[in-house]
């Protein structure tokens, strides 16, 4: 049986997100720097700069983006895997 990931929060540190998607923390940090991830920049009200230096990935936005990307694919590509299960329509 495969493992199921259950999270009790909508945001996780980018280092944990890297583990979830099988990428290095450096790769995920570069994705953040290029604006490719929905992140929350944690702030420290006690700090002079206001920045805590922590990025957390907002999972609902990530999941919505993946769903949109998947559903935007052409039907024959998006549903092609169903053919292998005998559930898709023949081309």
Curated annotation (Swiss-Prot):
<comment type="similarity">
    <text>To phage HP1 cox.</text>
</comment>
<keyword id="KW-0805">Transcription regulation</keyword>
<comment type="function">
    <text>Repressor of the Pc promoter which controls gene C, which codes for the immunity repressor, and int, whose product promotes the site-specific recombination over att.</text>
</comment>
<keyword id="KW-0238">DNA-binding</keyword>
<keyword id="KW-0244">Early protein</keyword>
<keyword id="KW-0678">Repressor</keyword>
<dbReference type="GO" id="GO:0003677">
    <property type="term" value="F:DNA binding"/>
</dbReference>
<keyword id="KW-0804">Transcription</keyword>
<dbReference type="InterPro" id="IPR038147">
    <property type="entry name" value="Cox_sf"/>
</dbReference>
<dbReference type="Pfam" id="PF10743">
    <property type="entry name" value="Phage_Cox"/>
</dbReference>
<dbReference type="InterPro" id="IPR019679">
    <property type="entry name" value="Phage_P2_Cox"/>
</dbReference>
<protein>
    <recommendedName>
        <fullName>Regulatory protein cox</fullName>
    </recommendedName>
</protein>
